[in-house]
């Protein structure tokens, strides 16, 4: 827990969590599906308890599992991912890319990508991305922002974004100019 607390109260390049989160706010956590190793069960209890200390109630937090185009997680897999304590306290949702009614439209990017994001991320004050950062063969890196796209985006958004993988600027470890990053 020390390392987790150190990371959230002394982060690199952003304010500490107690300067961002205020009492009574609503928070959504994005967690990985079983295809990505993240050990969420290690840090989610710490994050949820710290949110409580900062004045965020359990009923004002929830978890969205970033599935992208992968299969839904079972209830058992969700509990295993975040631990029994957290699973018993927070609502948990699969982000199912083919369930269009689960997404909110935000417009179209300059590259023509329609932006549909999971509705459970839209009516909160903060979205906290969890997981690991790894090299990705066309998106530059996996994890981080990829928790939102493709993780919590509708199929149409994912399909158009992934169509850019053949762009010469797409590639392993590339971020500058990479249309998929």
List the model feature ranges, each with a label.
Residues 149-181:
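Extended, low-polarity segments enriched in aliphatic/aromatic residues
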Residues 50, 137-159:
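A short, gly/pro- and small-residue-rich
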Residues 57-60, 88-89:
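Short acidic capping loops at alpha-helix termini that bridge into adjacent secondary structure
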Residues 12-28, 55-58:
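Glycine-rich phosphate/diphosphate-binding loops that line cofactor/substrate pockets in enzymes
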Residues 26-37, 62-68, 129:
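Short glycine-rich or small-residue beta-strand-to-loop segments that form or flank ligand, phosphate
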